[in-house]
Amino acid sequence: MIPATLNTYLVLSAVLFAIGFIGVLFRRNTLILFMGLELMLVASTLGFVAFSRFNGTGGGNVFVFFILTVAAAEVAVGLAIIVALFRKRQTVEVDELNSLKN
């Protein structure tokens, strides 16, 4: 088995971030947008953990806890907003959720 290097983790982090970014850019479903944002947060967390692991410092791990705290708050608020929008409009498509129309 080939040992994983810092570059391996950073490439994986970049690929995950790119997949999440593409999901945010090209999808019109709010749940998919939300999942893309979460994937981008996980990718940045992986980068911090990789730098922390290979540099021998614990500073990256502190940022991971902050990122996970923000992600947990984002999940709670984001899903509550999506559920409220679905109950009111019966859709989760971004194109149909114009609050300025009617």
Curated annotation (Swiss-Prot):
<feature type="transmembrane region" description="Helical">
    <location>
        <begin position="6"/>
        <end position="26"/>
    </location>
</feature>
<dbReference type="Pfam" id="PF00420">
    <property type="entry name" value="Oxidored_q2"/>
</dbReference>
<dbReference type="GO" id="GO:0050136">
    <property type="term" value="F:NADH:ubiquinone reductase (non-electrogenic) activity"/>
</dbReference>
<keyword id="KW-0520">NAD</keyword>
<dbReference type="GO" id="GO:0042773">
    <property type="term" value="P:ATP synthesis coupled electron transport"/>
</dbReference>
<keyword id="KW-0874">Quinone</keyword>
<comment type="subunit">
    <text>NDH-1 is composed of 14 different subunits. Subunits NuoA, H, J, K, L, M, N constitute the membrane sector of the complex.</text>
</comment>
<feature type="transmembrane region" description="Helical">
    <location>
        <begin position="31"/>
        <end position="51"/>
    </location>
</feature>
<keyword id="KW-0813">Transport</keyword>
<keyword id="KW-1133">Transmembrane helix</keyword>
<keyword id="KW-1278">Translocase</keyword>
<keyword id="KW-0830">Ubiquinone</keyword>
<keyword id="KW-1003">Cell membrane</keyword>
<comment type="similarity">
    <text>Belongs to the complex I subunit 4L family.</text>
</comment>
<dbReference type="InterPro" id="IPR001133">
    <property type="entry name" value="NADH_UbQ_OxRdtase_chain4L/K"/>
</dbReference>
<feature type="transmembrane region" description="Helical">
    <location>
        <begin position="62"/>
        <end position="82"/>
    </location>
</feature>
<keyword id="KW-0472">Membrane</keyword>
<dbReference type="InterPro" id="IPR039428">
    <property type="entry name" value="NUOK/Mnh_C1-like"/>
</dbReference>
<dbReference type="GO" id="GO:0030964">
    <property type="term" value="C:NADH dehydrogenase complex"/>
</dbReference>
<dbReference type="GO" id="GO:0005886">
    <property type="term" value="C:plasma membrane"/>
</dbReference>
<keyword id="KW-0812">Transmembrane</keyword>
<protein>
    <recommendedName>
        <fullName>NADH-quinone oxidoreductase subunit K</fullName>
        <ecNumber>7.1.1.-</ecNumber>
    </recommendedName>
</protein>
<dbReference type="GO" id="GO:0048038">
    <property type="term" value="F:quinone binding"/>
</dbReference>
<comment type="function">
    <text>NDH-1 shuttles electrons from NADH, via FMN and iron-sulfur (Fe-S) centers, to quinones in the respiratory chain. The immediate electron acceptor for the enzyme in this species is believed to be ubiquinone. Couples the redox reaction to proton translocation (for every two electrons transferred, four hydrogen ions are translocated across the cytoplasmic membrane), and thus conserves the redox energy in a proton gradient.</text>
</comment>
<keyword id="KW-0997">Cell inner membrane</keyword>
